[in-house]
Amino acid sequence: MKIQDLQDGDLIFTVRSSEIAAAIRAATGSYSHVAIFFNGEIYHATHENGVVNQDLSDFLQDEDVYDVYRYPAIDADAVFKRAKLHLGKPYNFSFYPQSDGFYCSEYIAEILPVFDTIPMQFGDEGNLISDFWQEYYRELGLDVPLNQPGTNPSQLAQSSKLIYKGELHD
């Protein structure tokens, strides 16, 4: 799929290479991040800056794989208004439900409310809770929210409500 074929409201799923991205993929599936496209910009929740918008070209410099999915019944104007409403909110580092701020798929599910929550998983091949997540939550001083309701990028991408449009190429 070419950049010029992107439509407002398209979801872009990515595979990042950071340690937390690898832990997310190990626990949940092939994608570690999701963002939404509007007017040549990307809206998403980031570890570094919380909920932000940035130029598509800047976003694309950060990632390797960009798979595009579309929700055909989207009311793009309404979703865009909700997307802007949350700009500046902090990142939800705890992944706990009803926390201040958003993690990436939580933000998308909030502004495009067509996705169900599922019990959150934090395991890997051998452990119910991976070593990475045990250390992550130890540093936060919190219990791992295992089986708490949440979302993840791979789960959103698997929704029957979305249509896969292809891998994004310039």
Predicted regions and their residues:
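Cysteine-nucleophile amide-bond enzymes
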Residues: M1-D170
